[in-house]
Regions:
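Acidic, low-complexity intrinsically disordered segments
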Residues: 1-212, 217-219, 480
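Short, electropositive alpha-helical surface patch
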Residues: 238-245, 334-354
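A structural motif corresponding to the C-terminal end of an alpha-helix
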Residues: 30-32, 217-218, 247, 275, ...
Length: 484
C-alpha cells in the first residue's frame, strides 16, 4: 500500500485544520495509507525531523503540507528543504485555498482549491506517468488550480473518519462539512462556488457515521461547521436534526448563518436546536436598506433588528447561545451616518452575554490568482467607487492583501477606505471590553472544565493561547505522536 504523510499547517492552536484530514480520508478510500500530523506550525524543527525519520519507508510517495490560507512558517520552510536533501525521491506537495505567496524550490507540486480529485490525478501523474493540467500562468511552479481543472464539487460524501493515531481528545472541537457551495451570490463575496441550485449535501447516513465514529473513538461531541451558509436549506437541517435525535449523546455546533433566513423561516429554529447549533456567525453587513438590497441582503433593517433579538432570546432559553455579527464598512450607498447609526444599535443591543460584533472595511480585490472576483470587484466603477487621489494610509491593514494580488484604494461619494479602516479600529476599541469568546474559539477552552454557561460569560481574551493547558496538550500530542 502506498504511503504518505500530510502535515496540517496553520497558526490557530488548538484547531485541527479540516483540509489535511479530508484529503487523507479521500486517499484512504482510494487505497492509500495516510498519516496526518496536526499543529505542525508549533513543532520544533528537530521534532518534525525525528517524526519523519520514524515514518519514512520504501512505500512513502509524498509528503504534503495542508496550509491554512497560505500559511507557511519558518519551521515548515526549513523542513521542506531538509526533506528534499535527505529524501530526494519523495515528492513534496503544498495544498491550500490560496496560491503560494512565497518561493520554495523544494516543493514539487502545488494544489489550490478543493483538491480531493486533483490529488488522485496528481498521484497518478508522478507515479504512473499519467496526465495532469498545470496552471500555465506560472513558469517556475507546477500549480494545479483544482477548482477549475479537477473540481471536487458538487460532492455528496463529505465526511471524515479520523484514526486512533490522530490522538484526538474528547474536549476538542472538530470541523464538519455538510455541503460544499453556497446557493446565494452576495455581491461582495469572492467564494468560488456561488449560486448552487440543487441540494448536494452529504447523506444523513454519512453524517451519522461520521459523528458516531468520532464519539465512539474519542468522545467528541462538539463541532465547527465549514459550510458557507449552514441554514441555506430547510430540508437539509431537518435531515441532520433527525439523525441527532437518534444519538445517545448531545451535539454542539457553531457555524455561519444567514440571519434573514432565520427570521423568515422560524420553522428551522427547532431542527437547528435539535442539531445543537447554538453558535451563530451572521453576516449582517449593514443596517442601511438601500445598501443591503444592493448586495443581496434586502430584508428591512427594522425587521432584522427585531428578529435578531428574538433569535437570541429563543435559542438562549434552551442552551447557552453565542451570536457573532459581522459588519462591512463601505458597501454601496452606505454613508458615514447610516454606518454609525447601525453600530450604535449594536453597541446598545448586541453586547449582552458577551455577544461580539466584528467590523471590517470593504476590500475590493482587482486581481487575484486564486479566487473568483466578486460582483463589486468586477463592477466597482459602475457602483460609484474611484481610486483615491491621495494614497490611503490604511491599505496595508486590510487583510486580503495576503490573498489578493491587488486591492483597490477606493473612495466614493460617502467615504473612503482610510475612513472605513479607522472607523472599524475605533469601534473595536470601544466594544472590545464587552467582547465574549468568539463562536470559532469555544474549543480553545475545552481543558478549562467550564460549562458552556460559564464560557458564555467569559471575555474574548480569557486564557488565550499560549497558555499552560494548551501547551501541555501540544507537548502531550507531539510526544505520543513520535512514540507511536
Amino acid at each position: 500500500m502506498d504511503h504518505a504523510l500530510i502535515f496540517g499547517v496553520h497558526d490557530m492552536m488548538p484547531h485541527r485544520f479540516l483540509g489535511p484530514h479530508r484529503i487523507a480520508h479521500y486517499l484512504r478510500n482510494n487505497g492509500w495509507d495516510i498519516e496526518v500530523v496536526d499543529f505542525a506550525s508549533f513543532w520544533t524543527l528537530e521534532q518534525l525531523k525525528n517524526f519523519i525519520k520514524s515514518r519514512i519507508h520504501k512505500k512513502t510517495k509524498f509528503i504534503g503540507f495542508g496550509c491554512w490560507f497560505g500559511n507557511w512558517p519558518e519551521n515548515i520552510d526549513m523542513l521542506s528543504h531538509w526533506i528534499k536533501d535527505y529524501y530526494p525521491e519523495i515528492k513534496i506537495i503544498y495544498g491550500s485555498h490560496t496560491y503560494p505567496k512565497f518561493n520554495n524550490e523544494s516543493i514539487d507540486y502545488y494544489t489550490v482549491g478543493y483538491a480531493e480529485k486533483a490529488i488522485i490525478q496528481l498521484a497518478n501523474y508522478f507515479q504512473n506517468n499519467g496526465t495532469i493540467k498545470f496552471d500555465t500562468r506560472w513558469e517556475n511552479k507546477k500549480i494545479i488550480l483544482a477548482n477549475d481543472t479537477y473540481p471536487a464539487f458538487p460532492m455528496n460524501e463529505l465526511g471524515v473518519i479520523y484514526e486512533h493515531r490522530d490522538l484526538i481528545e474528547p474536549w476538542e472541537w472538530l470541523t464538519i462539512e455538510f455541503t460544499r457551495g453556497c446557493k446565494f451570490s452576495c455581491k461582495f463575496c469572492n467564494y468560488p462556488i456561488l449560486g448552487v441550485k440543487d441540494d448536494h449535501s452529504t447523506a444523513a447516513s454519512d453524517f451519522e457515521y461520521t459523528v458516531r465514529d468520532a464519539y465512539d473513538k474519542f468522545g467528541v461531541t462538539n463541532y465547527y461547521t465549514a459550510d458557507e451558509t449552514l441554514n441555506q436549506d430547510k430540508s437539509m437541517i431537518e435531515k441532520y436534526a433527525n439523525v441527532a435525535d437518534t444519538l445517545n449523546f448531545k451535539l454542539r455546533m457553531h457555524g455561519f448563518m444567514r440571519a434573514d433566513l432565520l427570521i423568515a423561516n422560524k420553522d428551522t429554529w427547532d431542527p437547528l436546536s435539535r442539531l445543537g447549533v447554538f453558535g451563530h456567525m451572521y453576516g449582517i453587513e449593514t443596517f442601511n436598506k438601500k445598501t443591503g438590497s444592493s448586495v443581496g441582503k434586502g430584508m428591512d433593517p427594522l425587521k432584522v433588528k427585531e428578529g435578531l433579538l428574538e433569535i437570541r432570546e429563543w435559542f438562549d432559553a434552551i442552551e447557552p447561545y453565542r451570536g457573532n455579527i459581522n459588519m462591512v464598512c463601505g458597501l454601496p450607498f452606505e454613508t458615514k451616518e447610516t454606518w454609525e447609526s447601525g453600530i450604535e444599535w449594536l453597541m446598545k443591543n448586541w453586547t449582552s452575554k458577551g455577544d461580539i460584533s466584528a467590523t471590517y472595511a470593504l476590500e475590493i480585490p482587482l486581481s487575484s490568482m486564486d479566487s473568483k472576483l466578486s460582483f463589486i470587484s468586477n463592477n466597482w466603477k459602475a457602483l460609484g467607487y474611484r481610486r483615491r487621489k491621495t494614497p490611503s494610509e490604511s491599505l496595508h491593514a486590510v487583510s486580503s492583501l495576503k490573498y489578493a494580488d491587488e486591492l483597490l484604494d477606493w473612495e466614493n461619494d460617502y467615504m473612503d477606505l482610510d475612513w472605513a479602516v479607522k472607523s472599524c479600529n475605533t469601534i473595536y476599541k470601544q466594544y472590545k471590553v464587552d467582547m465574549g469568546v468568539s463562536v470559532w474559539h469555544w474549543g480553545d477552552h475545552g481543558l478549562m472544565n467550564l460549562s458552556f454557561k460559564d464560557l458564555q460569560k467569559k471575555q474574548k481574551h480569557y486564557n488565550q493561547w499560549p497558555n499552560k493547558e494548551l501547551e501541555d496538550f501540544l507537548q502531550r500530542y507531539i510526544k505520543k505522536k513520535i512514540e507511536l
